[in-house]
Amino acid sequence: MSILSFGSGTITDDDTSGANGEGTGITLANVPGVSRTHRPDTPPVALSIAGSDSGGGAGAQADLKTFAAHRVHGATALTAITAQSTAAVRGVVVLEPDFVRLQIETVLGDLSVRSVKTGMLATRAIVDVVADLAAAGRLPQLVVDPVLVSSSGHPLMDPDGIEAYLTRLIPHALVVTPNLREAAALTDSPLEDLLSVPAMSAAAERIRSHGATYVVVKGGHLTDVAHDVVAGPEGTTVLEAARIDTRNDHGTGCSLSAAIAANLALGADGLTAIRRAKAFVARGLAGGASWTLGAGHGPIDHFGWSASP
């Protein structure tokens, strides 16, 4: 087991290794988590299949901000539209599965998509649409953020939909990024049984046994350190970051999975993409910690604005 730590202050990432251990020549400058050595003539493309957050903190909006922060062109296929603020979700309209498919196929038919991430899929029927496309090899470097349970613990997917994730979608994923509640749902375990790094590691391996290459179980704030446990071909890796005391944590899961997809689109290998994404979110949390956007949980600082002169 290896452990990597990220502080809450300045985070650097000088490792620009690609999938073959060679430098990609692509890093980011003045953006949380990574830096850029040169600009490609044409930016790579990442696709987000997710719901819309009208408050701009999570969902497809957080994904697009994350892609832009990495200078990756972001495309979207919306699964649902929410009436949402920093304080509450007042309504949700789920789009028809056939229209979700049409959005995805329209993007894939025009843009050279290098990576794809999923967020809120809302229904079993939409999970099946995405799984069918993944099985056909049309969703490259797929990152699955299994949005199954709300932050308050309310189920967002029925048991049939969870089964579809396990048997139809996760087998085609390069990376899966459940939080503790979602890991509990995917492993049919009580949440209280997952509140340790060894238990998180075991849950990650159970989910990975369904066919994913990497599984990142996000521990949040188990103690004064935020632990994420990664199960992958290299074994188990524990990513640590100092706890940041802020209410501005809306969309952290969306931003993490989008940052993984962005780094994959830029040429990083799986574990490097995960590590860079963890650093990106840690910097975003630190940067936006004192913001006062809205009455509830605000977004993170995707663009390093707080660090800018």
What residue spans do the PLM features occupy?
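Conserved phosphate/ATP/ADP-binding segment of small-molecule kinases
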Residues: 159-236
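Phosphate-handling active-site elements
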Residues: 70-75, 237, 263-277
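Short pre-catalytic strand/loop immediately N-terminal to key active-site residues, enriched for Gly-Thr
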Residues: 49-55, 237-251
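Charged C-terminal helix
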Residues: 43, 94, 271-309
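Short boundary segments that mark the start of a structured unit
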Residues: 1-25
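Nucleotide and nucleotide-moiety/phosphate-recognizing core
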Residues: 125-140, 213, 227-236, 270-272
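Conserved N-terminal subdomain of the carbohydrate kinase-like
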Residues: 36-48, 60, 64-156, 303-306
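Short, small-residue alpha-helix embedded
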Residues: 66, 184-185, 247-270
